[in-house]
Amino acid sequence: MNNSCLSQSTQWWWRAN
């Protein structure tokens, strides 16, 4: 997994929460 991809994924779900 790419750190960049993971970071973006975490950000989008972080905001959605």
Curated annotation (Swiss-Prot):
One BP term from GO: L-tryptophan biosynthetic process
Keywords for this protein: Amino-acid biosynthesis, Aromatic amino acid biosynthesis, Leader peptide, Tryptophan biosynthesis
Function: This protein is involved in control of the biosynthesis of tryptophan.
Protein name: trp operon leader peptide
UniProt lineage: Bacteria, Bacillati, Actinomycetota, Actinomycetes, Mycobacteriales
